[in-house]
């Protein structure tokens, strides 16, 4: 197939869980015969990054880790594949002309390259939460001004996107995000007090990366998704509900003013949402497990406990306050998450750190430009680091 007939795509974060699944979908839908892989990026796993670049014929391979540049360069020697490293190179990957970009870099590091892709008019398949949580209205405007489409990849937001009737947006009454409840759904706070990262990362239904898995256990993942939903679907905070659904079969729902509720169901497999985003508005034929209703037997639901999982309450606080509070909450939680991995604070203290920093930064600045967002992010990380150090001293 000639280059002009292939769809040009880039994958920001190709070595993570979403990136690996995206390339699986690309392979199912024709691989390098159907797709021109303009750029792929990874963090420190340059062995996998080089393998992906070779397999799919990527034009550019970028590692975020400057120290891995030589290793990646050697691994791709003689292939003709361009190699680059560092934060600026990630932004360059987002700027390279392509039709569709998978935004799957975890954390605030994914914000600048995704904005760069949006500003030049690419369709954005959004898996990075921070673009909307931290930059919200600014990011949505960047996509709109660029002229591309914004297609959510999170299973919950993909479900809502698929359940929204375009000509009935005015009739949307509520958005219902489902949550598995994670591995600690039935645990008391006392039981959760001393859990380790290895225990927290064991999600009952989904296969995900470390950050998202532990975020699911603490329900910070769901808290971020609440803020995302507000910006993605232009709804009020009071229209966003969370319901715990342990089986993860109903991925989310939309309630309308006539009492109807539309939902998207499927087996827990990220490739379904990825395939939908890649093929939108069409639906691809994918080799994924089909839902067997006879074997389901039951679907359970329960209200979330915001005492045991305060992240949900913090999300509502951030939405009500507006400004840079989303960026502050996210930055403080990311900093606390890293401290938890390093065994410097406990599982429950992650939410404490986020809440303390949010309270400390009430009224801090405004989100008028991306620089405002980055400044708030940096300040929140600084204050979170101080709070973590204080908890260590008190321990």
Where are these regions (language model features)?
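Catalytic, metal-anchored helix/loop core of enzyme active sites in primary metabolism
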Residues: 1-395
